[in-house]
Each structure stands twice: as structure tokens, then as C-alpha cells.
Amino acid sequence: MARKNIIITLLVLILLALSIGAWYIFNKPHRSLEQAELISVSADSLLASYMQNEKIANAKYFDKALAVNGEISELTTNQSGQSVIILKTQDPMAGVVCTLQEIPETGLKIGQQVQVKGFCSGYISDVVLRDCQLIKEK
């Protein structure tokens, strides 16, 4: 009987710990680009860093806030309906994919120079930035 009570108590404590952990994970504050310190980089140098050594580039850029300068090579939307800007690089088969938080009010054009800020998600044939915002159009 005492053994059964100990097992039930342990199960309740484990469930309580899991519940507290889940609550903490789902309620932690969202990181904001406005509060983050930006690392300025061009689309070409960002892609070159990842192509030369992905491990070193991840240590430098992964999950950090970047301000990326480049020329728009493509404007599209993803499966979720979010606007996506692809920045041109010297490699015709790769670029910097920037998923925007909101649709820009201004009419962006292919070939236009822009500066985009966002969090780097890594490299999968393209460098991927998430939660992007347009800083300035040139």
C-alpha cells in the first residue's frame, strides 16, 4: 500500500513538472527585432560565408538578427501566404530568402536594392531569414 502511494505521488510530481515546463515554453516572450542588435551584412557575403564553412557561419549568424543588403531577384508568397523576398547573390542557383512578417505597403520591384532585417534560420541551398521587416528601399 505504501509503495502504491509513493508511485502515485511520483507520477503526480512528474505531471506537475511537465505542466510547468510546457507552460513556460508556450508563454515565453517573443524576441523582437526592434530590441535586437543587428549584424549588417550583404547578401553575397552572407551566402559566401555559408558556402565556405556552414559550421562557422552558423556560429556567427544562426538565430541572430541580421540586416541584409541586396537586390531583389524574386517576389513570391510561401505556403502560408506570407510575402517572401529573395535577394540576388553572385551564385545564380542560391540566394537569401526573406520571409516577411507583413506585406510591404510600397510596391517592391525586381532589381530594386533593399535592406531587410530578420533572424537567420540557417542554410538549405539558400540562406533563410525569418520574421523579416523591410528597413529601407533604395
Language-model segment annotations:
Residues 2-138:
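OB-fold and OB-like single-stranded nucleic-acid-recognition modules
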